[in-house]
UniProtKB/Swiss-Prot annotation:
The keyword Aminoacyl-tRNA synthetase does not apply. NCBIfam families: infA. It comes from Lactococcus lactis subsp. lactis (strain IL1403). Belongs to the IF-1 family. GO terms for molecular function: mannan binding; ribosome binding; rRNA binding; translation initiation factor activity. SUPFAM superfamilies: Nucleic acid-binding proteins (SSF50249). One of its GO terms (cellular component) is cell surface. This is Translation initiation factor IF-1. Pfam families: eIF-1a.
Length: 72
């Protein structure tokens, strides 16, 4: 899948789950299951419930995503 095919949306972390998984509520009200991208994991950026994040979604599976940025 090319990088151009992703859908980027903003959301808020609602819940944390085991294995660095998070439930994120998007701006349109949908909830997705998201993991942390490699660069966030490598730089030890902490993500807590209530944080505003940017999520990449694949057009093939809109229920799972990847957290690519945590807003300050």
């Amino acid at each position: 899948m090319a990088k151009d095919d992703v859908i980027e949306v903003d959301g808020k972390v609602v819940d944390t789950m085991p294995n660095a998984m998070f439930t994120v509520e998007l701006e349109n009200g949908h909830q997705v299951l998201a993991t942390i991208s490699g660069k966030i994991r490598k730089n030890y950026i902490r993500i807590l419930p209530g944080d505003k994040v940017q999520v990449e979604l694949s057009p093939y599976d809109l229920t799972r995503g990847r957290i690519t940025y945590r807003f300050k």
